């Protein structure tokens, strides 16, 4: 469907039937940007927060400060905007496959694996985009596995029926032996939205296709989830760790000269 929509939209754009502010056929040609993806980027650049969820958003901000690595399939800048408005240290952002080949610090980092509104052509929306994403999804799995060594992984707002989540989980479970898989099962949690459920329903699901058991928490009360994670005492914030890691790395490099 995405491929069809892009084809139709770009055709109408080139024929002058559709226009975009500050973006014309010349700019599309010079930058190699798909008008369809440009339109999506412009749409998701703007967002409004519902006053009804202010308390939940504040809890979300506090939770973000406890995270080491964040992976998201969202195009918008909601996560980085809220993180940076709360922390004196900015989160480091990687878009698409960028960062998976880099020697990153592993703290206060955001990986936007389906692209970002800042870079319209990185947006994953067409069949070709998803095929390319699937080919490189093992990189995401490698990043998750390296993170699991030190910290648990929490999927928030996704479902086990989500194709992307299943692909990511399957990629790394298929590479593990039974002992390693058991270690994984104790450290991965999926928090799934369940309308009308104010409490937390915890289940352990044995998924034969994924080849592992998963802890699944179902709830509508995400504020409670955010508050609980925010209470974790790490001793020092991930942003602080990244700051000092950079200093230590620089000292080691300078010492080696």
PLM segments and residue spans:
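Conserved catalytic-core helix/loop/strand module for nucleotide-ribose chemistry
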Residues: 1-123, 143, 149, 160-168, ...
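Active-site glycine-rich loop that binds ribose-phosphate moieties when present
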Residues: 54, 128-143, 171
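Glycine-rich adenosine-cofactor-binding loop
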Residues: 154-159
């Amino acid at each position: 469907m995405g491929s069809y929509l892009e084809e139709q939209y770009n055709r109408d754009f080139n024929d002058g039937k559709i226009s975009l502010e500050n973006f014309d056929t010349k700019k599309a040609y010079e930058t190699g940007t798909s008008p369809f993806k440009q339109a999506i980027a412009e749409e998701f650049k703007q967002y409004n927060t519902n006053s009804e969820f202010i308390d939940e958003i504040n809890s979300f901000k506090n939770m973000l400060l406890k995270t080491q690595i964040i992976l998201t399939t969202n195009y918008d800048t909601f996560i980085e905007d809220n993180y940076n408005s709360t922390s004196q240290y900015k989160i480091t952002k990687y878009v698409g496959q960028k960062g998976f080949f880099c020697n990153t610090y592993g703290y206060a980092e955001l990986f936007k694996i389906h692209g970002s509104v800042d870079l319209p052509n990185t947006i994953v929306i067409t069949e070709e985009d998803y095929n390319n994403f699937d080919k490189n999804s093992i990189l995401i799995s490698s990043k998750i596995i390296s993170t699991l060594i030190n910290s648990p992984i929490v999927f928030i707002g996704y479902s086990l029926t989500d194709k992307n989540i299943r692909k990511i989980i399957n990629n790394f479970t298929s590479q593990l032996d039974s002992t390693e898989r058991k270690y994984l099962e104790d450290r991965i949690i999926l928090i799934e939205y369940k309308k009308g459920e104010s409490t937390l329903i915890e289940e352990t699901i044995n998924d034969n296709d994924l080849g592992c058991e998963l802890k699944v928490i179902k709830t509508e009360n995400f504020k409670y989830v955010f508050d609980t994670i925010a209470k974790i005492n790490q001793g020092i914030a991930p942003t602080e760790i990244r700051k000092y890691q950079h200093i230590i790395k620089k000292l080691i490099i300078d010492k080696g000269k």
